[in-house]
């Protein structure tokens, strides 16, 4: 890739929502993320996404010629690999790959690339959570990093996406966006939310993923979905700025 420009954007935003009478939302909670595009050479697209202590880099190679067993005659085939921060990949990473595939498949205009292959590799540099118990922070960062890398690679997409981790604290029932490792340890339930956006990131089209683990009731679910939509909307707005800052210098006036 020639003269790739690395763009870093830091966004810090908080929850200004009024407390819910049944499930109080932590109004002091803030989410801090960093994103960088075009960080790797010798691949078609790459990105780095950092959220608190969780850091993921993603590379995209494609469209390329697939192996015979991978080829799909009418659409693009996806090869998704997740590599852990420590050790070798296990069943845990295979589950992350399946969830990541479920999120990315509806976003890509696959019929534009028949008999081709796109390789998406996510390397987790820092987990930011107890890997034996949780994977929501890693999954959320992998989703966001993969989307940015696909844009950097110039792969045709149908829509945008943004993903956030959420936790419900055990004693207070506070709904925390982007929880820390310490907050996860005292959580009643944990959730990874990924939403699909259209119309320039202004309209939510679909819930791509809601991966939940733990105990929660219907009211808490609706509350976290409401808060999650608000936070994903803010995140996708900042992702658009990152993309705009990256693409603008490449345009020929």
Each model region followed by its residue ranges:
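Polyanion-binding surfaces on beta-sheet-dominated domains and ring/shell assemblies
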Residues: 1-253
């Amino acid at each position: 890739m020639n003269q790739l420009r690395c763009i870093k954007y830091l966004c810090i935003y908080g929850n200004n929502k009024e407390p819910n009478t049944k499930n109080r939302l932590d109004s002091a909670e803030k989410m801090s993320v960093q994103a960088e595009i075009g960080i790797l050479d010798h691949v078609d697209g790459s990105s780095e996404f950092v959220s608190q202590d969780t850091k993921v880099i993603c590379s995209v190679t494609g469209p390329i010629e697939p192996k015979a067993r991978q080829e799909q005659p009418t659409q693009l085939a996806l090869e998704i690999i997740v590599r852990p921060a420590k050790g070798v990949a296990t069943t845990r990473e295979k589950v992350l790959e399946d969830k990541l595939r479920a999120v990315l498949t509806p976003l890509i205009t696959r019929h534009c690339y028949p008999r081709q292959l796109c390789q998406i590799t996510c390397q987790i540099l820092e987990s930011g959570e107890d890997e034996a118990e949780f994977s929501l922070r890693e999954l959320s960062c992998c989703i966001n990093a993969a989307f940015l890398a696909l844009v950097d690679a110039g792969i045709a997409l149908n829509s945008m996406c943004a993903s956030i981790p959420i936790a419900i604290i055990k004693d207070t029932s506070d709904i925390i966006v982007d929880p820390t490792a310490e907050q996860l340890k005292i959580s009643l339930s944990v959730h990874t939310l990924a939403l699909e956006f259209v119309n320039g990131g202004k309209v939510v089209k679909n819930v791509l993923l809601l991966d939940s683990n733990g105990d929660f009731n219907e009211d808490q679910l609706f509350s976290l979905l409401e808060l999650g939509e608000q936070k994903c909307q803010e995140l996708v707005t900042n992702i658009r700025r990152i993309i705009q800052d990256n693409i603008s210098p490449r345009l020929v006036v």
